[in-house]
């Protein structure tokens, strides 16, 4: 189920992030390969065995990574029908580890930022539905965060990341709020 890592990075640094994760994975004996597109702002590290992506996240300290802004363990890319995306996601995550929050993200590129408005609206509706049905628990005991990484309104990766071993900020980018004058 979790044979892939989606790794977000700054656009143009995909090759450096690929080299970094490949080296770190090899150090702990988990092998795979990277799929990337130059300038996409993310890449995939596909592990040789199912479950290895979560094992990588257990053994590598996220804060020790230099080029990777955010990560999540997931399966293959999903193509969801626009008619009932929330229902489809709810059905898919029944076998996922218990999560305590939802984070909707997209590539930090010009094309990716166009998904921002959709991501905010969809994320809010999805979180409300999952909390209402009890699929997402508010307790910190869960320790995992559900991630949706949007590529379009219907294409996405659905995965998880440990709350304490991933970036605390959406898309791995800290945002500063300036006081009003």
Per-segment meaning from a language model:
Residues 2-10, 14-142:
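Non-catalytic nucleic-acid substrate-recognition regions in nucleic-acid-modifying enzymes
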Residues 43, 154-156:
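Hydrophobic residues embedded in beta-strands of well-ordered beta-sheets
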Residues 144-147:
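A short glycine-rich, hydrophobically flanked beta-strand micro-motif that places a catalytic Asp/Glu
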Residues 149-151:
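Charged, structured surface patches that assemble and position nucleic-acid processing machinery
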Residues 156-181:
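Glycine-rich adenosyl-nucleotide cofactor-binding module
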């Amino acid at each position: 189920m979790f044979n892939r890592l989606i790794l977000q990075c700054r656009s143009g640094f995909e090759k450096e992030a690929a080299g970094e994760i490949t080296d770190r994975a090899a150090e702990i004996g988990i092998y795979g390969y990277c799929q990337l597109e130059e300038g996409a702002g993310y890449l995939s590290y596909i592990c040789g065995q199912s479950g290895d992506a979560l094992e990588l996240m257990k053994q590598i300290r996220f804060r020790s990574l230099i080029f990777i802004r955010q990560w999540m363990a997931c399966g293959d890319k999903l193509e969801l029908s626009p008619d009932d995306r929330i229902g489809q996601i709810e059905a898919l995550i029944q076998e996922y580890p218990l999560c305590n929050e939802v984070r909707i993200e997209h590539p930090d590129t010009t094309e990716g930022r166009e998904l921002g408005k959709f991501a905010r609206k969809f994320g809010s509706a999805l979180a409300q539905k999952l909390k209402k049905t009890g699929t997402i628990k508010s307790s910190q005991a869960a320790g995992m965060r559900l991630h949706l990484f949007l590529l379009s309104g219907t294409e996405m990766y659905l995965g998880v990341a440990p709350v304490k071993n991933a970036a605390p900020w959406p898309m791995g980018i800290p945002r500063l709020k300036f006081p009003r004058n």
